[in-house]
């Protein structure tokens, strides 16, 4: 029997409160906040812009540049959270390591996990070189000349280039031949979170499909840390950004076992408590590691309609030391609702039509400003088959239109 003490949760806005601070308060953070509040947790939401989705539901909100260590330390010392939950990559992660070492707060899953995964180089070297996991062939490059040398030296065409620090497909493109090189390098320099700089170039893998395997490290009733797996999530990406996802994606027993083995290896090394989005390429029974996020994953929004506990509830329970249940309820799918225009205070039309079909749901994120390719919501659907669920989810998202106020 573990000596780990059973979790005790306090009363929000009182001296006994269990305080959790989210660093990043977008649509994923918003759902984590709601899940935490349902367990009586006092939540502080931090983001770089005002009125972020998570700001709208938290007990308190702060606008802070999270890459500024001094500003971030000041707000953490002001609020004194028990647990810090990084919900985005663009954070002063060296500060999180310091705070964890100082005993100021516990970082979920760990400060090391946040630091390694904010940078594609850190997590790729851990996976491929330390853990020996199968990945695509890759090199890291600092200049366009180095990019050309990497391609000529074995990466070959076609290949993919990504900034080492970016998200949602920003700066990512496919290089199909020498004629694409100039534009791809410029785009990678523009798309990085810290401006121009280092990039990863990856050789193509001839895969059949890619999945997200949501992997949860949580304490059981005996206090021991256990690893749980959600059913695999298939997804479609356009320009590196998710547009639809579905669950469960069919896999051979051998491929599923290998996927879980890879996910167990990388999440076990990163450690801590919480959910991880492990991205994998699959061809037949072969599986390659792609990336991992130590937090809920955008493709996992489908779990809001498919699982007994969605990915946000799983993360909330796990980080609080509570048991989890990753069981699937019914096959389902998600489909993104884009802004389609640039503007503030937009309005959403067709929501009643979107929800008229049984087995559907809509989440509107409440972002204060729309952009043409910004995710403003998601359509959700369940059905007896994956094909039917995907078609239904597409109908839901297509029914919702975004208009200027």
Swiss-Prot record:
Cellular component terms per the entry's GO annotation: cytosol
Alphabetically ordered keywords of this record: ATP-binding, Ligase, Magnesium, Metal-binding, Nucleotide-binding, Purine biosynthesis
Catalytic activity line of the entry: N(1)-(5-phospho-beta-D-ribosyl)glycinamide + formate + ATP = N(2)-formyl-N(1)-(5-phospho-beta-D-ribosyl)glycinamide + ADP + phosphate + H(+)
Positions contributing to ATP binding: 120, 162, 167-172, 202-205, 210
Pathway recorded for this protein: Purine metabolism; IMP biosynthesis via de novo pathway; N(2)-formyl-N(1)-(5-phospho-D-ribosyl)glycinamide from N(1)-(5-phospho-D-ribosyl)glycinamide (formate route): step 1/1
Superkingdom of the source species: Bacteria
The ATP-grasp domain, residue ranges: 125-320
Annotated GO biological process: 'de novo' IMP biosynthetic process
Disulphide connectivity of cysteines: none
NCBIfam families tied to this protein: PRK09288.1, purT
Family the UniProt entry places it in: Belongs to the PurK/PurT family.
Protein name: Formate-dependent phosphoribosylglycinamide formyltransferase
Organism this protein belongs to: Bordetella avium (strain 197N)
Species classification: Bacteria, Pseudomonadati, Pseudomonadota, Betaproteobacteria, Burkholderiales
